[in-house]
Amino acid sequence: MLLRPRRPPPLAPPAPPSPASPDPEPRTPGDAPGTPPRRPASPSALGELGLPVSPGSAQRTPWSARETELLLGTLLQPAVWRALLLDRRQALPTYRRVSAALAQQQVRRTPAQCRRRYKFLKDKFREAHGQPPGPFDEQIRKLMGLLGDNGRKRPRRRSPGSGRPQRARRPVPNAHAPAPSEPDATPLPTARDRDADPTWTLRFSPSPPKSADASPAPGSPPAPAPTALATCIPEDRAPVRGPGSPPPPPAREDPDSPPGRPEDCAPPPAAPPSLNTALLQTLGHLGDIANILGPLRDQLLTLNQHVEQLRGAFDQTVSLAVGFILGSAAAERGVLRDPCQ
């Protein structure tokens, strides 16, 4: 029978950090829990390696005037502000270089602290209206001009995460409901309230209230509430018919009845164009055709003149040719010989 090797006992979880040290140094994966912590490197050694310095004691230490001046001087270097200008979204590597440069000057600040410090100085410079100038205003103004931060402060956008409760939308207030800020405003009764105030019904309903004798039966359905469309449509209007139903008979107008209001009747359809308008349009088209045919007529006249010239030249050429032929024939027959011979 094979014996399985015994498993080592589980390691105890690391103890929580004490309040005295708010920012403990993180351990590397290779360090054992029982080994003593490594000795922190000096700022000069970290500066030589090009690594940012992130001491725990510098997290809550306020910035001094010397540190602020060194930070602004480092940011004003051409290599630094050009790197920030070229890549604003990935500015953390550049601020690491800034932190390493400050570490060489015995200023122990993290890249995030350098970034927040410049943002704080920039915001304070924008908000300083009508106040005496500060010691670093000239450097901040120059750095903002180089980085293109002369605009107004942009609001910070926060997307609602899983840990933050989302705000519910406020309900849309009723148009007829009184504002809650008014002290004399009274709540309006609902549509289903049977003990509604008759004065409110008389004031806000479009039709006068009915008497108690004309109340509907208990089993009958409630009457539909009047709408704006129903008030615009006259009561004697014919009901809507389907597409297959025959047209309604024409209604006869009573000569004694007063004429209807212009807003009750539908607008008349657009009249077809008159004969004069059609004739004017036709004449306009004919004028366009005449304008097109005019240049063609001039070209035909020019061609006719050329043809007449060619015909005259052809007749003259034929006459010369005939005379030449007849003269040659007479010379051959001796007709033109001397009569003295």
UniProtKB/Swiss-Prot annotation:
One Pfam short name: Myb_DNA-bind_4
A GO CC annotation given for this chain: nucleus
Localization, UniProt: Nucleus
Name of the encoding gene: UTF1
Chain residue ranges for the region called Disordered: 1-62, 146-273
Major localization class: nucleus
Domain of life: Eukaryota
Posttranslational modification: Phosphorylated.
Organism: Homo sapiens (Human)
Keywords (A to Z) from UniProt: Activator, Nucleus, Phosphoprotein, Transcription, Transcription regulation
Record comment regarding domains: The leucine-zipper domain is required for coactivation activity. When this domain is deleted, the protein is able to stimulate transcription from a number of gene promoters.
Regions of compositional bias (Pro residues) in chain numbering: 8-23, 257-272
Modified residues (Phosphoserine): 18, 21, 54
Protein task: Acts as a transcriptional coactivator of ATF2.
Name of this protein: Undifferentiated embryonic cell transcription factor 1
Gene Ontology molecular functions: transcription coactivator activity
Assembly and oligomerization: Binds to the N-terminal region of ATF2. Associates with the TFIID complex through interaction with TBP.
